[in-house]
Amino acid sequence: DGRCIVWAPNQGADFVAELAAKISGVPVTAVEVRTPYLGGGFGRRFYTHHYLAQAVELARKHAGRTVKVLWSREEDMQHDHYRPMTMARYRAALGADGLPVALHITNVGDGPDRHSFPESIPKSNLDESVIEGAQKQPYAIPHRRVDYVYEPSRAPLGYWRSVGHSVNAFFKESFLDEMAHAAGRDPVEYRIALLKSEPRFRNVLETAAKQAGWRGKKWKAADGKDHAMGVALHLSFGSIVAEVAEVSAGAGGKPVVHKVWCAVDCGFAVNPLLVSMQVESAIAYGLSAALHEEVIIEDGRTSSSNFSDYPVLSAAEMPDVDVAIVNSGEPMGGIGEVATPPIAPAVCNAMFALTGDRIRSLPIKTAAT
């Protein structure tokens, strides 16, 4: 009858309608998208709708009949659009007080913007999704430079919860911690010294440190093991988040995360319970990726196929999370993704305080990788 009806979880009904219209041959105004509240998205259902394309193509060939397409977990994991692999080099010049006077960042990689919206890439070849979170941060560093080197990915790329912020917070906050230790200064105090003209950021950081009862040195805990804390601060999607993680060393030197304290300023929390739930979820998501998640590609194909060879964070590994909401009254920012970026650097910085070994890649395989 000249219509196309699509039932599918998605993160952009307009994108689904445009795709369905293109494949089915009906006008986009004749496409109806019905979105069930089913499962999560986290970027997977934003623009990578090849499973929908299959369903619409089959429906076109069998007009008048309802077609259902269901992928197995193995099919889904092996035909995903993946989080981009990214590398970075950070260099800094420190002044007599140990604070940075110049910072040079070089990011190397490919990004989801180029794969999903190639028309958005300017003639300069800059993919903003690769460097977001590397610039526009609050620290008072007089001279900064951010370079981007495009290294094309042969694997299909997609959006991942917090997108470029997820990697750039790890790079940036790990390096801030490294500079603090090189200067012989406490990591929290060092950041505060760089935030003298940023009271909103400073308040969030101080709130998280106070929550945690910040300790800059490792200590012997009640379980008889050495424990240590690490901190990270990051701005993303209009919201400021500071996180402190408490860790000890487990089997093989991998971190055991006992507790996370998080302070978040998203402007004003209309629904504080929902904000806390999103923060806890985002921390679990980021921690799972930091500790475990790795897609293995062998002989040109994805070999990871199920949770047996793609482990995720277990309930037993999930730390207690203490959330403090800072209502600054500033314009409201996002909340669904903003607590993901700081968790990996907070944990890795804590491991440095514990072991003296700097973790430089994710996921964490040993105490120093």
Regions found by a protein language model. Name each.
Residues D1-T369:
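Cofactor-binding beta-sheet edge motifs in enzyme active sites
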